[in-house]
Design a protein with these regions (language model features):
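Gly/Thr-rich phosphate-binding beta-strand-loop-beta motif of the actin/hexokinase/Hsp70
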Residues: 1-33, 128, 134-166, 220-228
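Short, charged N-terminal helix-start/capping segments
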Residues: 1-21, 38, 43, 49-53, ...
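Short glycine-rich, Thr/Ser-proximal phosphate-binding strand/loop in the N-terminal lobe
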Residues: 11-59, 157-190
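Helical "lid/coupling" subdomains associated with nucleotide-phosphate turnover
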Residues: 49-77, 90-138, 165-322
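Surface-exposed, interaction-prone regions with an acidic/low-complexity signature
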Residues: 83
Length: 322
């Protein structure tokens, strides 16, 4: 069976076409895994201005619909048997989301789903655990997106991953870049404002997710993978090198400061930096480093590193169709 999955977030829209492959272990137990056929991303900034206006901008809708048309063609060419389209933070917050949903349905011929933060967290967790291996009940996955960040505590692997508790908060690289007019280089005052918003968000997470019990941290999404590329000193973006890499708290903090201190032009010249992330990476890495710093404090030093996963909600969307 060939599965199609589309994740439409605040900053990007991504497509995964994968084959469901059944494998049998030495004990005769069958498991189903995904084998990638196509994996693509377009930066469309759907959430442009949503934090301030509460509406999806027409130019943002146009960019997203254009990418959706490309994906519709790829799904047709590769013969996907099932397709699921999931929209997250920006669409949840938008007063004109029906315009978006009607447009997507017309282009793709399927009904898009605007999922809750809770379901977003669950799908992110399932996708991340596919890549980092079976963990214990104290694995914390955080998915730092454009408009929101999901914190998920749980254990298990792939489709069997189980969420113990989760919380979605409205802190993301696009949202805070716009809210605090984050520049390049990022000023000390802007860092303080972004960190203050992040701290406030984490306080709301603690009320529903026992972060102090976490023994392992896993980070997913573009901010985390881009920082990993920088920390590894990659000349170009390399998914295989990034996936599963472990970074110390000190490395994350140091690399975040390096990226914050760069001008827009310096960031744009980095071989691993997607053009659509140049303007939002400063706020993104500030949020990322602050989350890991607070996790280190909350767990009394137990969490002092983070594992980076290339697999996230997009894989979770695909796994949900098995």
């Amino acid at each position: 069976m060939r599965i199609g999955a589309i994740d439409c977030g605040t900053n990007s829209i991504r497509l995964l076409i994968a084959d469901a492959v059944v494998e049998t272990d030495e004990n005769g137990k069958e498991t189903t895994r995904l084998k990638d056929v196509v994996r693509q991303m377009r930066i469309v900034r759907l959430g442009q201005g949503v934090d301030a206006t509460g509406w999806l901008a027409q130019e943002a809708l146009d960019r997203t619909f254009e990418a959706a048309r490309e994906y519709a063609q790829l799904l047709k060419e590769h013969g996907a048997d099932r397709v699921r389209f999931v929209a997250t933070s920006a669409t949840r917050d938008a007063g004109n989301r029906k315009v978006f949903m009607d447009g997507i349905q017309q282009i793709l011929g399927i009904e898009p789903e605007v999922i809750s933060g809770t379901e977003e967290a669950s799908l992110s967790f399932a996708g991340a655990m596919r890549a980092v291996g079976a963990g214990d009940k104290n694995t914390l996955v955080f998915d730092l997106g454009g408009g929101s960040t999901e914190f998920v505590l749980g254990g298990g692997r792939g489709a069997e991953a189980k969420v113990i508790s989760s919380r979605s908060v409205n802190v993301g690289c696009v949202r805070l870049t716009e809210r605090h007019m984050v520049s390049a280089p990022v000023t000390d005052e802007q860092v303080q404002r972004v960190e203050a918003d992040t701290d406030a968000a984490i306080e709301t997470v603690v009320s529903s997710v026992p972060l102090s019990t976490a023994t392992r941290a896993v980070a997913v999404a573009g901010t985390a993978t881009t920082l990993a590329a920088a920390a590894l000193g990659l000349e170009t973006y390399d998914s295989e090198a990034i996936n599963g890499t472990s970074l110390s708290l000190e490395t994350v903090q140091r690399t975040a400061q390096m990226l914050r201190s760069m001008t827009r032009q310096e960031r744009a010249e980095l071989g691993y930096m997607h053009p659509g992330r140049v303007d939002v990476i400063g706020a993104g890495v500030t949020i990322y480093a602050r989350i890991l710093t607070r996790l280190n404090e909350i767990t009394d030093g137990v969490i002092n590193s983070v594992t980076v996963s290339e697999h996230d909600i997009l894989d979770g969307i695909a796994l949900s169709q098995l």
